[in-house]
């Protein structure tokens, strides 16, 4: 975890100068998912440190929404996944939780990264549980489906590198809640900051 003094020194103004550009997201989802851990997710005056992510690899991935393209209602909602990387994909899960993702890779790949957990950085207090889970991420940062398809390289919603932050220790395991996905349920596509108190689930299952 970042030292308290270091966290307190971070400001949104400083983060804005270290915004991650769209080109950075033009890579495979599993690569981006791993490297987003330790970066900041910023929305307006609030920011959290990404501590847990999941990668979704396209239409062949049995857990990915990209597999629904061309199948009725899924087409409109999930078409954003086939656009260029660096764009937000926000959807409602089980009629309750807004889920925030970033599209990755070149257009046509259908890949995305789900932000599963953040730790408070700016404007979120000090409780590590505030962003512990994807539904809490969006609640903490004030995100919902109005932010779907937003360009994360412009505007007040973006990812940023944290200056002088050491690379966090990364743990890898299967994604959560995808038992329906057959063999894909056991693929090691969840990445988290090892032993961080803000992670939604620290074990591999």
Give each language-model segment a name.
Residues 2-205:
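Conserved, well-structured core segments that form or line functional sites
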